[in-house]
Amino acid sequence: MIFSTMAKEFRYKGYTLQELEQMSLEELAKIMPARQRRTLLRRLKFGWSDQQKKLFKKILLAKEGKYKKPIKTHARNTIILPFMVGVTVHVYNGKEYVPVQIKPEMIGHYLGEFSFTTKRPKHSAPGIGATRSSAHVSKK
């Protein structure tokens, strides 16, 4: 058996990244899942929020090399679109900004999916009185 070491080219629903970047947002919405399609079509009809407009402007400037500072945003409900690929966006999780490197596989997902708002709890040993066997242990 001969295995190829060449990386598999990225495709989203059969389209390459270059084809996705050339599509209009209406065409892109047609191949998105229902929730993202609804959001995109509503944004096209009613307009993008001010936060999203600022985010898109900064991303386009960063891709041209004119914006050097980290791109920070609170807009966790922004859908990742093809023109955003290759940029690092710092997404607010309620406490801090988490850097998210946007990759082609993330197209169609929301920014908030990659910046978790909760941490996993770290439990220590149970305290005195936490179990029935430790209820009668002296507290000294």
From Swiss-Prot:
GO annotations of cellular component type: cytosolic small ribosomal subunit
> Region labeled Disordered — which residues?
120-140
Q: Which GO MF terms does the UniProt record name? A: rRNA binding; structural constituent of ribosome
Keyword list (alphabetical) reads: Ribonucleoprotein, Ribosomal protein, RNA-binding, rRNA-binding
Polar residues bias (residue ranges): 131-140
Q: Name the GO terms of the biological process aspect.
A: ribosomal small subunit assembly; translation
Q: Which residues form the signal peptide?
A: none
What is the top-level taxon of the source organism? Archaea
Which family does the record assign?
Belongs to the universal ribosomal protein uS19 family.
Checking PANTHER family in the record gives: RIBOSOMAL PROTEIN S19P FAMILY MEMBER (PTHR11880), SMALL RIBOSOMAL SUBUNIT PROTEIN US19 (PTHR11880:SF2)
Its function?
Answer: Protein S19 forms a complex with S13 that binds strongly to the 16S ribosomal RNA.
Write down what this protein is called. Small ribosomal subunit protein uS19
